[in-house]
């Protein structure tokens, strides 16, 4: 494969040498000193460098909007980037990456800066900028030609066009990019074309206000100019008497844009921001060719690397036959763990599952740990031990349980985890006494934390992973009630597109949380975890288990109960009675989470949202949610035991409670 690619790669590099000179030039940039400056090698500089380096590997996002933060506290770098709604995804990511690199060279010491390109905008700051309307700083790009006809006719046509686009953009919804284009008949037999766009993190009202402010600036910045851009951090608008955007159906984000028309040859543009004037790149054709060649090279390289990566992952999965785990720095002596747990005494036993028991331990330095000791006669447990260790050792996220190390001695297999004092989520939400500690704010925090942990597994980690056993007993809570996903013994690597399903004849997990297509047909994908997450959300809200659920009207399971009440307009019947007595109770937010939960358990796999969409819906309270379709009704009162079953054979079952564990299996 590599031998076939090398000649083509060489040719592409040679062609690139002749086209690289035509790189796009930013329309304008502003370096702000309001929030202070930084120096080289400081924490802020390091975080900014990490942020800029990550831009070239952004995941494809259909709305072209990214909110990324790196670092902590005062040295945290927050960024927002957005592409114009008619820009293809490949071009979008390239534009953002280029904008980031360019901005740090133009603003080398400022902690806050923004840059505008024709196809994207990028900004960063050490303050919070997400979910905030910002109309300053602003800039405008204008043509040099004036309209020479009747002023009143021009202004009437232009205002009518932009006001109409503004009204549509402010209600079109975040999933549609808040991007609208349109045209109208202008004076002197001309057609006026317009474009408006808001960032999707602001509300409908803020979008409308931002665009209104932009329209109000036109008389002072762009009076009678035949073609202008007016841009701020939260929105932008543009107009011209020619089609300057790629025509797309804004009701269909996936539609393919056509080739844009070119403006008149004698049209030039200038930038106005204070006393600044900056020209717009003229070599558009050469720049486009350069970008196309670079994109082609990247595509070929990605294909090659993905083939190599799949081979490496297959090799790593086959390494279970090798007893020697190379990460010696994480290895504990068996005697150390034996002493820490008082020889695995009953007093220190925290719980037990199908593959062994979990014990609390204290190391000689006072550090508390949780030790998972696999059963000596469980061959399947040995396989799970290696699988879990090799996977979890590579994962680092605040919403995943932290693996501290392992121990192998003779037939002994042990995993060492951080100790979490509040044990597992099921001990709280299913207990009427402990449930009093879970106010709505805490439950919402847990829902959001689990969602972000799953997003990391599905999309942001080095290895894309399906958990396959997400449930309340596998969500551990630290002293601040921060949720941490545990139990990766059932997890699987998944290095292909998330819309594609895999098949297995080994069904593992817990009934009530398992997606029907997985239980009945052995199909699993990232949407399998999404289904489990939806069940968990409904359990957190109701304080009831999906499996074995019962209510006054005796409906079979929690999902059925939630769906029926949703359709009847009384979804709040689902809510835990304890919550309704608490000061933090918020019916609007609870209704929103019920909606999200039902979206996640929809019967059709393709209609379930990705975890990236779920996190966006949870973080963006103004995002309009779609109406859920019929859920996958699936009612079982038993759980699959930790001994897995095969399709076509009777599954060994055990009581639901006996399958819950305090720490990962």
UniProtKB/Swiss-Prot annotation:
Domain of life: Eukaryota
Record PTM Phosphothreonine, positions in chain: 510
Cellular component annotations (GO), alphabetically ordered: membrane
Spans traversing the lipid bilayer: 284-304
PANTHER family: CYSTEINE-RICH RECEPTOR-LIKE PROTEIN KINASE 26, RECEPTOR-LIKE SERINE/THREONINE-PROTEIN KINASE SD1-8
Keyword Metal-binding attributed: no
Subcellular location(s) per record: Membrane
Binding of ATP, residues: 350-358, 372
Entry keywords, A to Z: ATP-binding, Glycoprotein, Kinase, Membrane, Nucleotide-binding, Phosphoprotein, Receptor, Repeat, Serine/threonine-protein kinase, Signal, Transferase, Transmembrane, Transmembrane helix
Name by which UniProt lists this protein: Cysteine-rich receptor-like protein kinase 26
Modified residues (Phosphotyrosine): 417, 518
Record domain Gnk2-homologous: where: 26-129, 135-244
Sequence segments annotated as region (Disordered): 251-275, 641-665
Domain Protein kinase: 344-624
Residues at the catalytic site: 469 (proton acceptor)
Compositional bias (Polar residues): 647-665
Modified residues (Phosphoserine): 473
Family of the protein in this entry: Belongs to the protein kinase superfamily. Ser/Thr protein kinase family. CRK subfamily.
